[in-house]
Amino acid sequence: KYLHKNEKLLIDGCHSLASAKNLNDYLKSLNGPIYGICGIQKNKKHEKFIKIFKKTFKQLITVNIPNESNSLEKNKLALIAKKNSLEAYSAKNIVSALIRISSEDNKTIVIFGSLYLIGDVLKNN
């Protein structure tokens, strides 16, 4: 109910550098703008992970991973993204992020960065 008919939603549990590269390679094959929603664990290589998507996302929205004490704080993740030349913002949660970027325009929205985040998305939506 938060997406328009011209929008595609992709969810990917990628959380390692190798899986981020694979996701990024796939995203490069898509047409149209791509928006990301990302939450990641503190123990990951945040800078390298985000840098992989540097030229892929039109905008990146960062979120905390719900009920996960090891979640990297969303504002810290947004700062890392901005340092890597991404237009980035933080959102309260997945729903807030979807509301922020959803519109009538054709686009792909990708939720990624943690299996815990994806599990929460699937459980609640």
What does each model-found stretch correspond to?
Residues 1-59:
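Nucleotide phosphate-binding/pyrophosphate-handling subdomain across enzymes
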Residues 8-11, 50-108:
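C-terminal helical cap/extension that packs against the catalytic core
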Residues 114:
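Active-site-proximal loop/hinge segments that shape catalytic or ion-binding/gating pockets
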Residues 117-119:
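Short, active-site-adjacent cap segments at secondary-structure transitions
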